[in-house]
Amino acid sequence: MLSGPPRLVPFIFVAFVLALVVWYYHGVSSTGASLSTWKPGSSFATQRPASLRPGVDPLDFSIPLRFSDGQPKPAGSNYTLKIVVPKTTKEDLAWMQEEIPHAPLVVYEVDNEKAENKVPKNKGREAMVYLSYIIDHYDDLPDTTLFMHAHRHAWHNNQLMGLDAAQIVNRLNHDRVARLGYMNVRCHHDPGCPDWIHMDRPGGDFDFFHKPEEIYWRKSIWEEIHPGAPIPPSISGICCAQFAVSRDRIRQVPLERFIHYRKWLLTTGMDDQFSGRIFEYIWHYIFTGHEVYCPAMNTCYCDGYGICFGGRQKFDDYIKKQDDRNAKWTQLDEFNKRADKAKEEGKEPDFTDAEKVTMDTLRSTIGDMDRELDKLREDARKRGDDPKMRAEETETYDSSHIWDYAPHGDKI
């Protein structure tokens, strides 16, 4: 039995709930439409990267991605790692199994149709492999992905680590990769930095010995790869397509862009060698948004690998000593070549007395310099074991103690 007129509150509540339900489904539907290019397949694949502004087409390169700084794990934590390696059937990876057995490998044997990991076409050198891995594993990435070549020793590996790729893997500081997002594992600037590719360079100024790829780097190519993006005055980044990237940084780049890059590789009429070289000088742009990306060499060695000389000037002093030593070795090598040629001809080398003195002096000087350089490197490694020393040579935007480095009384 009703004791009075119906209460107004329940009706208002029901109306509110119905309105909320309608709003919810309308919101989900409209959001889904704006993200139609983001194909579901996992919980992550349905989300937009935080670097992409709401309502922006992932392939609109005129609007830069907003990359965010990463955070290293707490001290003592482990990082998951995978090494992506392109190779041919003739290349041997036994050195990786021997020297870095702890590192999981994802191998792409590009000329083997029965290989476990496949690329759509053997084209574009390592770029096709790198892009295919990212596309295929976008939702299942380790903390750090290290993209590397198959050979252990190469001129483009780090000089202070014996040009040894195994040391790159074993000494790599994953905290640095997590913090920066992207790290070229080569520290030396040349070739590629600080001022390398110019898309408006006059034809008569091309350097076909040091930069054979520059003639292919024209405005039209940039616009094909990054439609809508401003033409940069220079593209400069450390060679040679070996780098580490964090999971978060890869996922801050929309998946559609990696698919777009690979499609360009598949369809371009450019020679295979140079289409791969095109990407060699834009990996840093893809993962940082910077056309020019040339981290300080001493910082790369110190924070990246624990080889700390105590600042840029001391690092530069070491490099100069090393260059001087190498110049003397080149001088001595000319004498050695003459001796080898004479031996092949069954003769005694016809060195003058003055030349013999020069050779002895060079051998002695080189020996002394080698011992000095060895000690400097050993001291640098010991310094790198000290977290405070490493912090002294690590990039930072923190200015809280910056005036501690100014000459006394110069603070303004």
Residue ranges and their predicted role:
Residues 2-412:
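ER/Golgi luminal nucleotide-sugar-dependent glycosyltransferases, focusing on the catalytic module
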